[in-house]
Amino acid sequence: LLNPEILVINPNIKIKGGNNVGGIIGTLYNGTLTGTYTPEFSATNVIVSKIPRPIFPGNINSEKPYRENATSVGGIVGYADKSTLRRLFTQPSIYGRSTVGGIIGYASDTQVSDCGVKTETFNNGNNSAIMIGGIIGQASCSSHCEFSNLVNYSDITSGSNYIGGIFGSMVAGTSVKINKVVNLGKISATNNVGGIIGKTSGKDIEVYDAANFGVIQGIAGDKECGVGGIAGAAEDAITIYKSVNHGNITINRNAKYYGAGGILGYVKQGGAHVRYCCNRANIDY
């Protein structure tokens, strides 16, 4: 049990490393991490709980060459495989080149629930970074995965591709269920930008009760890329149910996105099942 009232970490601590770097654990295999945080939501998915003391408030990879080159960097765990993380809140400053997340950098067949992130700095200045997520940089599931009760307070204002408020990239070889996830931060990047997920790949991904309150900005964009309040782009079919976007979506001039939408920006193949969803914000494209 990770209790921030007992486990007190110096906020000035600095962690430096190349791959699989985490504020608490670098690589976690077949393990469980449990804290004391529980996010509370209103009936309309507004966060009503107070921001608690974080498990890790330090600094990860703020110096060269780590900030430009590191992969699988997480505020709690860098790389997690066949593991479970729950009830964790962190507030790091974090940098990396790819698969960077506020809780986990790269999550393989891992379940995550009741977690929150409010970073001081999130990858600021690394505009070539890919797969950046407020909670998880990239999630890859070859067996059934569930993610629930997740909240991101952090702005992510730089990045190249697969940038999302909760997940940068979601790859599903089997069924994935995402339930009650909320983004409050501004998400601004170049390609495949989403309030909840940057881009999905896989035919059995279901999103329920998601809400985005942050501004979503597409900076440049290219064909086969999208910008969306919930998901930027989907490589295959996706189901989005009872979800809402409250954040304005803005696209810079001369951008070449295939699409921008209040819920979903672009679907490449297989179609999308969008039911009982609502966009309550402006789209400037």
PLM features per residue range, with description:
Residues 1-285:
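Predominantly extracellular beta-rich ligand-binding scaffolds that present long acidic/polar faces
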